Design a protein with these regions (language model features):
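Transmembrane helix recognition focused on a "late"/terminal membrane span
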Residues: 2-48, 84-159
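Membrane interfacial helix-start motif at the N-side
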Residues: 33-76
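Hydrophobic, membrane-inserted alpha-helices
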Residues: 59-65, 80-90
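Hydrophobic alpha-helical transmembrane segments
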Residues: 77-78, 101
Length: 159
């Protein structure tokens, strides 16, 4: 697995934070990362900013479909599909289209979450896809994940 110097620095910060505060990274509902205490299983907020924070991954902000595919984090597509379906139903009911806001929100979330997801992938020794493969496969999966919302809007919105 190839990890950039910047990402390795983020992973090292995450590891130091986890060790210092007796925490572990888990995925809630298999979808997004959370921190849990090793002693009492309580949930803690992710450390994303500040001196001990993991920071923001701009590559994950601009290309979440590709980086998540590369590390085999396919829950991204379920997360994306869920929010687009909700946005489609809101569009059907209210006439207001929030799909652009949903896309922007997903990109921001994965910009912050990606260092933790990368940490989990490294910890679990997940085999990675090559960059070109992850871009092509990720685009295909991303399109497939928005098909349900397209169908909902096509069937229920009559212009």
């Amino acid at each position: 697995m190839t990890v950039s110097v910047a990402m390795q620095a983020r992973i090292d910060k995450i590891d130091a934070h986890l060790n210092e505060h007796n925490l572990r990274v888990e995925k809630l509902y298999g979808l997004y990362p959370i921190l849990k205490s090793n002693s009492n299983d309580s949930t803690k907020s992710l450390a994303c900013s500040g001196a001990k924070g993991s920071g923001f991954s701009w590559i994950a902000f601009f290309f979440p479909y590709a980086v998540c595919t590369q590390i085999r984090e396919f829950s991204f597509f379920a997360f994306q599909a869920s929010f687009y379906i909700i946005a489609a139903w809101i569009h059907v009911i209210t006439g207001k289209d929030f799909s652009t806001g949903v896309a922007f929100g997903i990109c921001i979330a994965y910009g912050y979450w990606f260092p933790y997801l990368r940490y989990l992938a490294l910890k679990e020794n997940r085999k990675e896809y090559a960059v070109f493969q992850s871009i092509i496969f990720g685009l295909f999966l991303s399109f497939a994940s928005i098909i349900p919302s397209i169908v909902i809007e096509s069937v229920f919105i009559h212009n």
